[in-house]
């Protein structure tokens, strides 16, 4: 396909998750999309070269195998380098498109075309199980102190109560669509986060020049933390690390000082105490290493 004919580029990062990735690609084909598109898979340092196995099943896909895990942002950035579509749709490999995806995704692209001041969209995100349960229907801003926010609709049954288009402060990393020209202007994802908070930081950067929206006219299914696991040491390390980095990069003046004090000396130590009492020493170690790594990163870039 000539690169000028491609309307949409799906960008998918795979890490030891070939089963989920194949299921996602199956859902793309089953949706019988009515617009030109390409599927890009970045195998981000899997133990085996899973890209070649995926390519054998679906010869038309594009992508590559990278022998080092570059993290969520780094993998997506490799996809950006390859993609030629007018719009980039970043979707986690543990998501599934619905059968209605053709019309819904076309609607997202039309909305972005008609509103050039919009920098990105995230659709309604539903859990794979239980059925019809919301994961994401927009979000509140992050607290300036705790660096936490609320995902609207989380855990609720989808009864149409979040079917209103709304401006949001942050895109959801499991599913976000951006025009290529927006990325050309603001740059690629900040790869130093490796995992977690990179889409929040990117959203802050995009939001300085554009507006971001929750787009309920489209939806996707997400299996949640199939790739990292709930409360895994990996997840604990990077959440503890990256909250500190995000605060240092995006909070200003006294807000930054108070946020860092809270994250390190209040929330950080309280988390450590809880994990100690619970006897979760592996998670405790990951948490403390994460905080130490975050503090070290901040000191290096001062």
Describe the residue ranges of each PLM region.
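Short aromatic/hydrophobic "clamp" motif used to bind/position activated sugar donors
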Residues: 88
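Glycine-rich, basic loop-to-helix element that forms the pyrophosphate-binding segment
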Residues: 65-83, 93, 99
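N-proximal low-complexity "stem/linker" segments adjacent to membrane-targeting elements
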Residues: 1-30
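A short, conserved alpha-helix in the catalytic core of glycosyltransferases
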Residues: 169-219
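Non-catalytic, C-terminal membrane-associated alpha-helical segments of glycosyltransferases
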Residues: 234-242, 253-302
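Short, flexible, basic/aromatic active-site loop/helix in glycosyltransferases
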Residues: 141-168
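Conserved donor NDP-sugar-binding/catalytic core segment of glycosyltransferases
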Residues: 96-136
């Amino acid at each position: 396909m000539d690169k000028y004919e491609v309307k949409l580029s799906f960008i998918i990062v795979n890490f030891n998750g070939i089963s989920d990735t194949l299921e996602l690609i199956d859902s793309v084909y089953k949706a019988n999309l009515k617009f030109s598109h390409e599927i890009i898979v970045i195998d981000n340092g899997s133990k085996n070269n899973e890209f070649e196995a995926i390519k054998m099943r679906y010869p038309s896909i594009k992508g590559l195998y990278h022998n080092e895990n570059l993290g969520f942002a780094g993998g997506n950035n490799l996809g950006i380098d390859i993609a030629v579509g007018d719009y980039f749709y970043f979707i986690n490999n543990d998501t599934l498109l619905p059968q209605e995806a053709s019309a819904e995704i076309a609607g997202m692209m039309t909305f972005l075309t008609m509103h050039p001041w919009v920098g990105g969209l995230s659709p309604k995100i539903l859990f794979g199980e239980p059925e019809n349960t919301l994961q994401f229907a927009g979000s509140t801003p992050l607290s300036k102190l705790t660096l936490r926010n609320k995902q609207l609709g989380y855990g609720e049954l989808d009864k149409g109560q979040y079917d209103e288009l709304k401006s949001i402060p942050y895109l959801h990393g499991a599913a976000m669509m951006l025009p290529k020209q927006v990325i050309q202007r603001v740059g690629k994802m900040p790869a130093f986060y490796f995992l977690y908070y990179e889409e929040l930081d990117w959203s802050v950067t995009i939001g300085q020049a554009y507006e971001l929206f929750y787009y309920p006219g489209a939806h996707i299914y997400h299996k949640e933390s199939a790739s990292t696991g709930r409360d895994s040491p990996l997840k604990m390390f990077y959440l503890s690390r990256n909250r500190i980095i995000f605060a240092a990069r995006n909070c200003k003046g006294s807000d930054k000082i108070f946020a860092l004090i809270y994250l390190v000396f209040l929330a950080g130590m309280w988390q450590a105490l809880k994990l100690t009492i619970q006897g979760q020493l592996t998670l405790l170690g990951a948490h403390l290493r994460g905080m130490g790594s975050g503090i070290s990163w901040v000191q290096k870039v001062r």
